[in-house]
Curated annotation (Swiss-Prot):
Broad class of the protein's primary localization: cytoplasm
KW Chaperone (keyword) present: yes
Subcellular location: Cytoplasm
UniProt keyword annotation of Cytoplasm present: yes
Region (Disordered): 197-230
GO biological-process terms attached to the record: protein folding
Name of this protein: Urease accessory protein UreE
């Protein structure tokens, strides 16, 4: 196993590395959205190289990160992150609404997202929701609940990731495929451990039974993320 403790650079952001690896063979370390949020993991590259990732706690890997480079063989180990697409809901137009309308719309939107068990992060007057179903289904939910007046679009997860703090990225992309977790709407403040609104919706237990939580509450997590299971 090869221990990786530092990132050498990024082939997608650094012109120096772009030129250096222009004719190199890239051995990809392919990570899914959950793995990408971990600073420590063990995984093999596409060429079978066994890597042990051990980065500083607040460092997470980014798409295009260069982990190793062998000039003699002209081979570089580069990170490839596969993130889900994201629905982006623009809330800017609510600024022109009355306070009552704004509160009502935000509450109803949160309720709708909660009922679908969709994770979400609010930032820069936008709501980011990772896709867990077809875009047609998400489009239908928005229109069925009367949110067609709110502009929304679908973009690649990689376009959203640079705008997020590490904690927000973990919240949005870490385990977005889980169907039995609560929906979390993060604080718009770019803080590593901000509190968030937790919207409790219907939970399936895998045995055919389900139940509904009709209460909302907010609480902080301290310095860790966790799922709620019943």
């Amino acid at each position: 196993m090869i221990l990786i403790e530092h990132v050498l650079g990024n082939v997608k952001k650094d012109p120096v590395w772009q030129e250096k690896l222009k004719h190199a063979t890239l051995d990809l370390l392919v990570l899914d959205q959950r793995e990408a949020q971990k600073s420590r993991c063990r995984k093999s590259t596409t060429h079978g190289l066994d890597l042990g990732i051990s980065l500083d706690r607040n460092v997470v890997l980014a798409d295009g990160d260069v982990l190793a480079w062998d000039e003699e063989t002209n081979v570089a180990v580069v990170v490839q992150i596969n993130l889900r697409d994201v629905m982006v809901i623009d809330l800017s137009e609510l600024k022109s609404r009355s306070p009552d309308e704004l509160i009502k719309t935000c509450f109803e939107l949160g309720h709708a997202l909660g009922n679908q068990h969709w994770k979400a992060v609010t930032k820069n007057n936008e709501v980011y929701v990772p896709l867990t179903v077809a875009t047609t289904m998400m489009d239908s939910v928005m229109r069925t609940h009367g949110f067609q007046h709110l502009p929304f679009r679908f973009v690649k997860g990689g376009e959203i990731l640079p705008q997020l703090s590490n904690s927000e990225a973990r919240l949005l992309f870490g385990g977005a495929e889980d169907s039995d977790t609560h929906v979390h709407v993060a604080s718009p403040l770019d803080e590593p451990h901000g509190s968030g609104l937790h919207i409790h919706a219907i939970h399936s237990h895998g045995d055919g039974d389900s139940h509904n939580h009709d209460h909302d509450h907010s609480h902080s997590h301290g310095d860790h993320d966790h799922d709620h299971k019943h």
